Amino acid sequence: MPIGADLVLHEQANPTAIVIDGQALGKVVEETARRYGTPLAFAHMDLQLEKAVLLEILGIPVTDIPLYHFSGDPGAEAVTRVREALGKPLNPALQAHIDSVAYIAQKTDLVPIGMTIGPFSLMTKLLKDPITPIYLAGSGMTADDDPDVALVDRALELSLLIVLHSVAAQIRAGAKAIFMAEPAANIVYVSPKQIEAGSDIFERYPIGADRRVKALLQQHGVDLIFHCCGELNDYMVRQFCTLEPVILSLGSSRKLWEDARIVPKDIVLFGNLPSKHFYSDAVITRAQVEQLACELFHRMAEAGHPFILGSECDVLNVPDSTAVIRDKVDAFVRCQCDGSRVVQA
């Protein structure tokens, strides 16, 4: 099963108009689920959406938003400004995103799955260099000690505010689960050496913020589907499991049959075919996709862990490569895995 709404969206004549039209976007989500034979209707993934909404509220020109980063702590007044703005009519794209969830809930027999970026990953998009201050925080420095640590803390506070608002709105729209993509919670942004030395930085920053989202979901009886396609170690995977997701989606760098040893069996593993590379036959061919799908299918069967064969992340459209990508998605969705192509260890 792919997370493929973006691919289907860009098959349409007017994708830019669709993403601000909730019913039209909902129909794209519905078409995606029905095409790939799944009852799970995953909302469109746009990991720039919440950043755009947040910075628009703070008065950043629309044309500057994609490359914009805070140069310093915007202060407590920024938090107040965002909180007040979220009580007013929403950004058209965010409203359409929420309305697409409502369309699935009200107009179809599919299971509506909401979508959000994780607060930690959103924070990293707001800073030019998030790695250094995260490291400083992991070494014990606080916002009072260093202005860059103060900036990380403020950016995370703002990120959590917008994510919680989006998730709450999607819950009201009828979402039965929320897919939270937290790709930056990985060994690039958080030092494994600091963790090994006893730092609680991973728990304090990504996991601590994610627990706030999880608490909101629990309050409303909504499930968490957690995704991270970044480079991870086993400690990080175990920490993700403490969030008690019903599904854990990991990137292609992980061997899911090995992760099955550390992930509780009440958490379904999802993935993790390298869909980021489907755009190029020079990187991966259709035949290789089929082989990887068969190998993963059979290794997971041997592991005896609940599993959904899927893409490692959402399958993004790449201009001029749409047909190639779609062909590889079809290859693993419709692959008849008989075990003959399983690679022997």
What residue ranges belong to the model's regions?
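Active-site loop segments of alpha/beta catalytic cores
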Residues: 1-7, 15, 93-345
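Active-site-flanking structural segment that lines cofactor/substrate pockets
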Residues: 4-37
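Glycine-rich loop at the start of a catalytic domain that most often binds anionic cofactors/ligands
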Residues: 11, 48-63
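Solvent-exposed, flexible loop/coil residues
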Residues: 22-23, 74, 277
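Catalytic domains of carbohydrate-active enzymes, especially glycoside hydrolases
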Residues: 25-47, 168-177, 239-246
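A short acidic, glycine/proline-enriched capping/turn motif at secondary-structure boundaries
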Residues: 47-50, 119-121
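A gly/proline- and charged-residue-enriched helix-loop-helix capping module
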Residues: 63-106
